[in-house]
């Protein structure tokens, strides 16, 4: 029997209501080296903020603030 660790949402702890797409340094923490969005089971963010993170990353990519992938192979 395994016990799951309680999720800890960093955005709830900071009382952030909205995740800004212009805050590139924060968004980079939630992107893998391959360019994929890190899942919430790894980051521990709640579902509400995970959706906001993915929307902000997609918008920042569209506006060329973030790359779609770091390495092209």
From Swiss-Prot:
InterPro entries: Ribosomal_bS18, Ribosomal_bS18_sf
Keyword annotations from UniProtKB, A to Z: Ribonucleoprotein, Ribosomal protein, RNA-binding, rRNA-binding
Top-rank taxon: Bacteria
Pfam family, one: Ribosomal_S18
GO molecular function, one term: small ribosomal subunit rRNA binding
Cellular component, GO annotation: cytosolic small ribosomal subunit
Transmembrane segments: none
BP terms from Gene Ontology: translation
NCBIfam families, per the entry: S18
UniProt-listed HAMAP family: Ribosomal_bS18 (MF_00270)
Subunit relationships: Part of the 30S ribosomal subunit. Forms a tight heterodimer with protein bS6.
Protein name per its UniProtKB record: Small ribosomal subunit protein bS18
Protein species of origin: Coxiella burnetii (strain RSA 493 / Nine Mile phase I)
Source taxonomy: Bacteria, Pseudomonadati, Pseudomonadota, Gammaproteobacteria, Legionellales
């Amino acid at each position: 029997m395994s016990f799951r660790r309680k999720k800890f949402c960093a955005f709830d702890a900071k009382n952030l209501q909205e995740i800004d797409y212009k805050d590139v340094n924060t968004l980079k923490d939630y992107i893998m080296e391959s360019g994929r969005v890190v899942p919430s089971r790894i980051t521990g963010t709640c579902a509400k903020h995970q959706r906001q993170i993915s929307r902000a990353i997609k918008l920042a990519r569209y506006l060329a603030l973030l790359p779609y992938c770091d390495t092209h192979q």
